[in-house]
């Protein structure tokens, strides 16, 4: 039997944003000092680098340890909404870049204005399910609801043209199963997959542009996402032989993933080389 015939088929529609993701350089650039950020990107533009997709990171929403997801108001210490709106216009209208926010519907902090325990998934012991540090895992079904509710508000405020939707493709669907018997699809990974897939489609609709995510388990979502970090840390690619057939024959036709991300995504469990 031919090896490639055994590869699973990803039954998602191809991305309709490959003309952007495939022709532009992608960069995650978390908000710091907005005037300094503008000088940095103006210098990039001055050097002739024009086809660029820039997605902000969670620092656009927080100044310290406050909530960074399920937000419609940006970090006050960075100038708040007025500064974020002006920066969005500078990146897109002045420089001609594709620019958008960080968002995430997988991590939810108790200090968030929308917080309620009824939004949080339950584990098999019926306890609140933990997620990222200081966060709990939102119910996938409710995550869809809030994506559909909040994304248009942010788009009306800031006029983005892309977004980074963190974590959704980093975790496996079976790692975020909601065991709350009150929800449809309780105890099933399918409920997670369909919810996260719908979130990606809602993202594209909201920004009228490509949506990116974190990768590692992105094969399930390619096509629904337009790009991801092309990483597979659990395989430990710095230590094991590369079998690229699945990536090239199944994933590449659906979306445009980028590189290996940060070097520690490639050197997942071994020290990075200090010289070349």
Language model features with spans:
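Active-site-adjacent "subsite" loops/lids of carbohydrate-active enzymes
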Residues: 89, 97-154, 240-249, 255-258
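Active-site-proximal helices and loops of the catalytic beta/alpha 8
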Residues: 57, 88-90, 97-100, 192-235, ...
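Generic structural signal for well-ordered alpha-helices
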Residues: 37-42, 84-89, 147, 151, ...
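Substrate-binding cleft/loops of secretory-pathway carbohydrate-active enzymes
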Residues: 64-68, 108-122, 172-177, 212-265
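The substrate-binding groove and active-site-proximal loops of carbohydrate-active enzymes
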Residues: 19-34, 66-81, 129-148, 178-192
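Active-site neighborhood of glycoside hydrolase catalytic domains
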Residues: 139-214, 219
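Carbohydrate-recognition beta-sandwich/jelly-roll modules
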Residues: 1-66, 72-78, 90-99, 103-105, ...
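Active-site clefts of carbohydrate-active enzymes
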Residues: 130-132, 169-182, 222-223, 267-270, ...
């Amino acid at each position: 039997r031919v090896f490639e015939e055994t590869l699973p088929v990803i039954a998602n529609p191809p991305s309709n944003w490959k003309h952007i993701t495939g022709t532009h350089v992608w960069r995650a650039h978390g908000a710091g000092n907005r005037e300094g950020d503008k000088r940095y990107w103006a210098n990039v533009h001055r050097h002739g680098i024009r086809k660029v997709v820039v997605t902000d990171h969670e620092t656009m929403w927080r100044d310290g340890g406050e909530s960074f997801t399920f937000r419609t108001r940006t970090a006050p210490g960075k100038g708040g909404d007025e500064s974020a709106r002006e920066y969005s216009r500078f990146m897109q209208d002045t420089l001609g870049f594709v620019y958008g926010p960080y968002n995430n519907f997988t991590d939810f902090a108790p200090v968030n204005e929308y917080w309620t325990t009824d939004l949080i998934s339950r584990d098999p012991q019926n306890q609140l399910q933990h997620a990222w540090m200081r966060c709990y895992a939102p119910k996938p079904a409710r995550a869809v609801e809030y994506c559909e509710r909040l994304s248009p508000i942010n788009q009306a405020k800031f006029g983005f043209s892309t977004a980074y939707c963190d974590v959704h493709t980093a975790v496996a669907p079976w790692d975020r199963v909601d065991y709350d018997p009150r929800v449809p699809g309780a105890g099933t990974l399918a409920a997670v997959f369909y919810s996260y897939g719908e979130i990606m489609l809602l993202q594209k609709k909201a920004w009228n542009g490509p949506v990116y995510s974190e990768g590692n388990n992105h094969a399930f979502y390619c096509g629904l996402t337009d790009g991801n970090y092309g990483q597979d840390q659990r395989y430990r690619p710095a230590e094991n032989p590369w079998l690229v057939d699945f990536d090239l024959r199944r994933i590449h036709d659906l979306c445009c993933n980028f590189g290996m991300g940060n070097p520690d995504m490639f050197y997942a469990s071994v020290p990075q080389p200090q010289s070349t």
